[in-house]
């Protein structure tokens, strides 16, 4: 029930990764990357399907060898989500996966080779109508830029990116997006800000090698949150040393928190104190797990007492305000006569939230049909 974010997005060109639109006002796409051995086709396919179930828009797959390229062909046949092939060092692998139907090529200018090899990759991408992501990384800058700047700086990352943007421009190829990732939040943020002023291509956001599940999520939320709040960014990936499924969840949580893109339930819950009338923490944890399959955007407030409960509930799709033995229940901002038993809170809320999701989905389908007419 909250309003959309007061964010004006940076204008950028439109490209497509498979059927997913990127840039020019398209929804910000959430990306992840497999961490299986690509040659283990079954494991990689299983992981991609797990990512699909939590709503991933694009999946990147590392293709380090020709054997991995052959495995990629089999993987591509078994999944629905667009796949980006991550290519380093051997440009010939890019040519092979392009033949096998890759949806996007990610190349690192610092290690893909000389200009002639880049030209060959670009000509191949043009032939198959495949976009490219120029992936600049603070940890793998070109040697001459390392010598020039001494260490990764925003200017160094910008110069690396612009060097290869200019190269693609000379080759008359404009189906590309760019990233300038770094593990340091300030370095990454400033690099993206500089790049956003220089080009109008879509930008892929990320804080590279951000860390484990908790620290990496925090670091990514700060860095990407700053950029997204300034309207910068068209796709994103949360790089975590964790299950890739968690990357997707954190990515959507960041977009949801900024009210940029809603998917699933936004739980509003108090941290609890001695005033709580029911187990708020247990209730929220259980509902988050039980309702992971719900993709309908909803704000659900779960507050343990009457201090802030009514205020939050009146601006939520559904809300609970803690009371003695039974708690107040709100729907669409209106308090209902019906109260919920504190001892059976989780089951009652799950049933009501699922029913509400069904109603909202049906209404949305009707709206879409009317627009199409």
Curated annotation (Swiss-Prot):
Its cofactor is [4Fe-4S] cluster. It catalyses: (2E)-4-hydroxy-3-methylbut-2-enyl diphosphate + oxidized [flavodoxin] + H2O + 2 H(+) = 2-C-methyl-D-erythritol 2,4-cyclic diphosphate + reduced [flavodoxin]. Signal peptide: none annotated. [4Fe-4S] cluster binds at residues 270, 273, 305, 312. GO terms for biological process: isopentenyl diphosphate biosynthetic process, methylerythritol 4-phosphate pathway; terpenoid biosynthetic process. InterPro entries: Dihydropteroate_synth-like_sf, Enolase-like_C_sf, IspG_bac, IspG_bac-typ, NO2/SO3_Rdtase_4Fe4S_sf. It comes from the Bacteria. Binds 1 [4Fe-4S] cluster. Converts 2C-methyl-D-erythritol 2,4-cyclodiphosphate (ME-2,4cPP) into 1-hydroxy-2-methyl-2-(E)-butenyl 4-diphosphate. This is 4-hydroxy-3-methylbut-2-en-1-yl diphosphate synthase (flavodoxin).
């Amino acid at each position: 029930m909250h309003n959309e974010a007061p964010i004006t997005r940076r204008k950028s060109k439109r490209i497509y990764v498979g059927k997913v639109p990127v840039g020019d006002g398209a929804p910000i796409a959430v990306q992840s990357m497999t961490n299986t051995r690509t040659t283990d086709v079954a494991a990689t396919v299983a992981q991609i399907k797990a990512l699909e179930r939590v709503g991933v828009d694009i999946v990147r797959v590392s293709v380090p060898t020709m054997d991995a390229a052959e495995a990629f062909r089999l993987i591509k046949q078994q999944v629905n989500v667009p796949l980006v092939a991550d290519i380093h060092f051997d440009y010939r692998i890019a040519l092979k996966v392009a033949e096998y139907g890759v949806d996007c090529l990610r190349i690192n200018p610092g290690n893909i080779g000389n200009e002639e090899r880049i030209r060959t990759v670009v000509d191949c991408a043009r032939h198959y109508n495949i976009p490219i992501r120029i992936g600049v990384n603070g940890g793998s800058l070109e040697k001459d830029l390392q010598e020039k700047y001494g260490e990764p700086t925003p200017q160094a990352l910008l110069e690396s990116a612009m060097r290869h943007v200019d190269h693609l421009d000379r080759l008359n190829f404009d189906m590309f997006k760019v990233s300038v990732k770094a593990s340091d939040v300030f370095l990454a943020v400033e690099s993206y800000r500089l790049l956003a002023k220089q080009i109008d291509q879509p930008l892929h956001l990320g804080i590279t090698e951000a860390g484990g599940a908790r620290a990496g999520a925090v670091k990514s939320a700060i860095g990407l949150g700053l950029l997204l709040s300034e309207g910068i960014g068209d796709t994103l990936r949360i790089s975590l040393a964790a299950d890739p499924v968690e990357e997707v969840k954190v990515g959507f949580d960041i977009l949801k928190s900024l009210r940029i893109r809603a998917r699933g339930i936004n739980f509003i819950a108090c941290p609890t104190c001695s005033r709580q009338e029911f187990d708020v923490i247990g209730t929220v944890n259980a509902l988050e797990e039980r309702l992971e399959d719900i993709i309908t955007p909803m704000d659900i407030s779960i507050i343990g007492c009457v201090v802030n409960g009514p205020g939050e509930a009146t601006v939520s799709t559904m809300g609970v305000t803690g009371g003695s033995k039974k708690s107040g229940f709100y729907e669409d901002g209106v308090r209902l006569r019906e109260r919920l038993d504190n001892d059976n809170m989780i089951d009652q809320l799950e049933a009501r939230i699922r029913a509400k999701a069904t109603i909202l989905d049906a209404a949305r389908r009707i709206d879409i049909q009317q627009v199409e007419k």
